[in-house]
């Protein structure tokens, strides 16, 4: 009997069978042919494409068609602000930065301080706005182009978005929104209206919009795809990623509510070492003797999976690590140490860039070339 798994926008449980998920969601697999097209246009392939971390799509082929015809496309992603971001939160942003660089695309990043406030009874609006600022620093630290990126908070940009949002809202029924977003009779009316706000940025330009996100977010965009053409816009295209497994094992995804499952961007080197050594699920054997004899299983080993997803970009080196671990030559502790060193180097550089980002917030939100254009626009 195959393992059962659940993937919704609110919950990821079990060991996900991504091939089955493609069938369930009705998306398309990113084929080798499609990857070759991307490589021909971009000049190379991001590690997350080479290793099938981004594995599924909707209309990515049409996005590439438009690019080849010099129509271009734009990128859209977002963040519901939280008290702290972890490594898993950065995956779509890191990949989006590569797409922006390679395809010279405008990027819109929606910070949903309103939705976070409305969804959680215990949060105040001041709290979610404060978290938004901190999260924006982490996002800017990824390295986006300040003149081609507009970061906006819903509570600040609502006046400019409201006309198109009203048109979107008129096309959506309560029953559709309730089913897609998991609402019920006790949900506040702000949450019922919010999906229209989330769809609005897909209509910021009269080009095709590409959304890089986790596969669990796919249902949110089905509503947009149902109504976009009736408003004179393209259906939003998506490129979907797998979930970076939590430290505790290959099932589910990292959770902010369970600190032991995640490495946070603020974790210091000692915290990183402690978490990896103590919590990172191992595919190794229970003793050194057995490990030397039988080797480890990289498929279920979380430190290996993290290296494979992103932290060891050299394909020859990751193959070497896999072979040494599988043969028993490399021990679990040695594999964990490789990840610890990679993580701490990454986080040290991220913190440096985050400090620099404090001087750039106004550029991304208000003063950059794209930001200025956006504040002069009313979207209708």
UniProtKB/Swiss-Prot annotation:
GO terms for cellular component: cytoplasm. It is an enzyme of class 6 (ligase). Keywords: Aminoacyl-tRNA synthetase, ATP-binding, Cytoplasm, Ligase, Nucleotide-binding, Protein biosynthesis. Its EC number is 6.1.1.2. The keyword Protein biosynthesis applies. One of its GO terms (molecular function) is tryptophan-tRNA ligase activity. Pfam families: tRNA-synt_1b. It comes from the Archaea. Its main location: cytoplasm. InterPro entries: aa-tRNA-synth_Ic (IPR002305), Rossmann-like_a/b/a_fold (IPR014729), Trp-tRNA-ligase (IPR002306), Tryptophan-tRNA-ligase_arc (IPR020653). It catalyses: tRNA(Trp) + L-tryptophan + ATP = L-tryptophyl-tRNA(Trp) + AMP + diphosphate + H(+). It is found in: Cytoplasm. SUPFAM superfamilies: Nucleotidylyl transferase. GO terms for biological process: tryptophanyl-tRNA aminoacylation. A motif ('HIGH' region) lies at residues 81-89. A motif ('KMSKS' region) lies at residues 253-257. The keyword Ligase applies. HAMAP family: Trp_tRNA_synth_A. Belongs to the class-I aminoacyl-tRNA synthetase family. PANTHER family: TRYPTOPHAN--TRNA LIGASE, CYTOPLASMIC, TRYPTOPHANYL-TRNA SYNTHETASE. This is Tryptophan--tRNA ligase. It comes from Saccharolobus solfataricus (strain ATCC 35092 / DSM 1617 / JCM 11322 / P2) (Sulfolobus solfataricus).
């Amino acid at each position: 009997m195959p393992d059962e798994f659940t993937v919704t926008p609110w919950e990821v449980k079990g060991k996900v069978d991504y091939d089955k998920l493609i069938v369930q969601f009705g998306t398309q697999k990113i084929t080798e042919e499609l990857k070759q097209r991307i490589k021909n246009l971009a000049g190379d392939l991001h590690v997350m494409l080479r290793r099938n971390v981004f594995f599924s799509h909707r209309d990515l082929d049409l996005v590439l068609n438009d690019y080849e015809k010099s129509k271009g496309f734009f990128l859209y992603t977002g963040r519901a602000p939280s008290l702290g971001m972890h490594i898993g939160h950065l995956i779509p942003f890191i990949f989006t930065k590569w797409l922006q660089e390679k395809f010279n695309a405008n990027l819109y990043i929606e910070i949903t301080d309103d939705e976070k406030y409305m969804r959680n009874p215990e949060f105040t609006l001041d709290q979610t706005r404060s978290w938004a600022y901190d999260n924006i620093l982490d996002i800017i630290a990824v390295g986006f182009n300040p003149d081609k990126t507009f970061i906006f908070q819903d509570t600040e940009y609502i006046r400019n978005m409201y006309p198109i949002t009203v048109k979107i809202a008129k096309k959506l029924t309560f029953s559709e929104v309730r089913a897609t977003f998991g609402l019920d009779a006790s949900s506040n009316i702000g949450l019922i209206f919010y999906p229209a706000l989330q769809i609005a940025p897909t209509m910021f330009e009269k080009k095709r919009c590409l959304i890089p996100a986790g596969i669990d977010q796919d249902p949110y965009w089905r509503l947009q795809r149902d109504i976009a053409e009736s408003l004179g816009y393209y259906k939003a295209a998506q490129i979907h990623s797998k979930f970076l497994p939590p430290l505790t094992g290959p099932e589910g995804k990292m959770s902010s509510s369970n600190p032991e499952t995640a490495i946070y961007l603020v974790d210091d080197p000692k915290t990183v070492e402690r978490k990896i050594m103590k919590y990172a699920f191992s595919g190794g054997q229970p003793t050194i003797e057995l490990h030397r004899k039988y080797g480890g299983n990289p498929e279920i080993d979380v430190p290996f999976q993290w290296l494979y997803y992103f932290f060891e970009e050299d394909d020859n080196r990751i193959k070497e690590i896999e072979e040494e671990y599988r043969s028993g030559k490399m021990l679990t502790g040695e594999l964990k140490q490789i990840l610890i060193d990679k993580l701490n180097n990454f986080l040290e550089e991220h913190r440096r860039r985050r400090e620099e980002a404090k001087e750039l917030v106004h550029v991304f939100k208000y003063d950059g070339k794209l930001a200025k254009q956006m504040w002069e626009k009313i979207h209708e």
